């Protein structure tokens, strides 16, 4: 039986210019016919640069945006970014010396950076890496990730959502999901028809003394209208537990691809066991479907940069780079174009 969600994989050509090259643990966001890329690593836990790369879908060429305004001061890995309208927002990330970036926006019309929030201030969100970001028309959301830590405390994971109100420039933490909710990094995180979904991720046990650092297959959503969290049971072609996978929303579907399905004994320094499978979750029926494999990336990968995008009039999942089973990084640019949803 053919899946309900029909689409096709397209390897996007990159015809030159100065681009990000092979990397992982970076962030991308799409605005109009441009793709923006920031941060990342080529070797484990070593930053590369703090340039903002711009890909033009019309010419299929890369360039570097000139750093006008309050540009990022830290070369980041484990950073995330999202787009709202014509602005992109970056949050967190760190360099190899554990200097952490803050929260900034970049106006794609004026090509100017704006400093918005210093992280780790009292009453505001904490600095972090390997978190997840999502957005709607009025908010930027940050979920999970790994804390900064320090000389007196060990880095830990988060389980809460931080919400930034774009209109008034203020942060608020949404209701805590409670002790039965795993703290996670590298989770799927998406706004679908007004609800905020958390899908899978790399988890810390909810049982005192239990096993930490494992792949989760939990799926929950937060409803801003009722201010309540709900954990759901999904069915169908359910993917195995995983983290650091590419994902995007198209209609009522959360599309995911690849990711780490088993952690490496050397932690982030190794590749882990990676996937090259794609799935779509219908958030109304809670049924998973497996995506078609024709044209999909043949080599498994994780820690890709990802975003929802519209390319040639079709909505879908766009992803760049990632870590391969050889522990090398790739600079592939792939788009899963949805034909029907």
UniProtKB/Swiss-Prot annotation:
Expression triggers: By jasmonate.
Catalytic activity as recorded in UniProt: a (Z)-N-(sulfonatooxy)alkenimidothioate = an epithionitrile + sulfate; a (Z)-N-(sulfonatooxy)alkanimidothioate = a nitrile + sulfur + sulfate; (Z)-(indol-3-yl)-N-(sulfonatooxy)methanimidothioate = (indol-3-yl)acetonitrile + sulfur + sulfate
GO biological process: defense response to bacterium; glucosinolate catabolic process; leaf senescence; nitrile biosynthetic process; response to jasmonic acid
Effect of a null allele: Accelerated leaf senescence and increased pathogen damages.
Keyword Nucleus in record: yes
Activity regulation, free text: Not dependent on the presence of Fe(2+) although supplemental Fe(2+) increases nitriles formation.
Listed result of changing residue 244 to C: Strongly reduced activity upon benzylglucosinolate but slightly reduced activity when allylglucosinolate is used as substrate in the presence of myrosinase
Disordered as annotated region, ranges: 1-24
Location within or outside the cell: Cytoplasm; Nucleus
Cofactor requirements of the protein: Fe(2+)
InterPro entries referenced in this protein's UniProt entry, alphabetically: Kelch-typ_b-propeller, Kelch_1
Entry GO CC: cytoplasm; nucleus
Phenotype upon changing residue 94 to K: Reduced activity
Annotated effect of mutating residue 264 to N: Lost activity
Entries under Gene3D superfamilies matching the protein: Kelch-type beta propeller
Record annotation: effect of changing residue 18 to S: In strain: cv. Ei-2 and cv. Tac-0
Sites where the protein binds a (Z)-N-(sulfonatooxy)alkanimidothioate: 46, 94, 129-130, 157, 186, 211, 244, 303
Kelch repeats: 34-82, 87-133, 139-194, 203-249
Annotated effect of mutating residue 264 to A: Strongly reduced activity
Keywords: Cytoplasm, Iron, Kelch repeat, Lyase, Nucleus, Repeat
Note: The proton donor differs depending on substrates. Does not contain the mannose-binding lectin domain present in other members of the family.
Annotated function: Specifier protein that contributes to constitutive and herbivore-induced simple nitrile formation. Converts glucosinolates both to epithionitriles and to simple nitriles in the presence of myrosinase. Promotes the formation of epithionitriles after hydrolysis of alkenylglucosinolates containing a terminal double bond. Mediates indol-3-ylacetonitrile (IACN) production from indol-3-ylmethylglucosinolate (glucobrassicin). Triggers the production of 3,4-epithiobutylnitrile from 2-propenylisothiocyanate, product of 2-propenylglucosinolate (sinigrin) catalysis by myrosinase.
UniProt-recorded name of the protein: N-(sulfonatooxy)alkenimidothioic acid sulfate-lyase (epithionitrile-forming)
Source organism phylogeny: Eukaryota, Viridiplantae, Streptophyta, Embryophyta, Tracheophyta
């Amino acid at each position: 039986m053919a899946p309900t969600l029909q689409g096709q994989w397209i390897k996007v050509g990159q015809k030159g210019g100065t681009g990000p090259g092979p990397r992982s643990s970076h962030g991308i966001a799409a605005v109009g016919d441009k793709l923006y890329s920031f941060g990342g690593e080529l070797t484990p836990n070593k930053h590369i640069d703090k340039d903002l790369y711009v890909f033009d879908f019309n010419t299929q060429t890369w360039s570097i945006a000139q750093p006008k305004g309050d540009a990022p001061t830290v070369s980041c890995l484990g950073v995330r970014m999202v787009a709202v309208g014509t602005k992109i927002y970056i949050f967190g990330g760190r360099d190899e010396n554990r200097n952490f970036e803050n929260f900034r926006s970049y106006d794609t019309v004026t090509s100017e950076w704006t400093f918005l929030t210093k992280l780790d201030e009292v009453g505001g969100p904490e600095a972090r890496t390997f978190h997840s970001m999502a957005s709607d028309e009025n908010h930027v959301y940050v979920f999970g990730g790994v804390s900064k830590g320090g000389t007196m405390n060990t880095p830990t994971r988060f389980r809460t959502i931080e919400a930034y109100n774009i209109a008034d420039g203020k942060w608020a933490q949404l209701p805590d999901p409670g002790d039965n909710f795993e703290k996670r990094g590298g989770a799927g995180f998406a706004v679908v028809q007004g609800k905020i979904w958390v899908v899978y991720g790399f988890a810390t046990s909810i049982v005192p003394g239990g096993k930490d650092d494992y792949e989760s297959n939990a799926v929950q959503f937060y409803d801003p209208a009722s201010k309540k969290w709900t954990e759901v049971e999904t069915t169908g072609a359910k993917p195995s537990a995983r983290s650091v996978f590419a994902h995007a929303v198209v209609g009522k579907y959360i599309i995911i691809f690849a990711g780490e399905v088993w952690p490496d004994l050397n932690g982030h320094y190794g590749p882990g066991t990676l996937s090259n499978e794609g799935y779509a979750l219908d958030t109304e029926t809670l049924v998973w479907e497996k995506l078609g494999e024709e044209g999909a990336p043949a080599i498994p990968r994780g820690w890709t940069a990802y975003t929802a995008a519209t390319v040639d009039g079709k909505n879908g999942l766009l992803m760049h780079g990632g870590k391969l089973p050889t522990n090398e990084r790739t600079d592939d640019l792939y788009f899963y174009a949805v034909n029907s949803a």
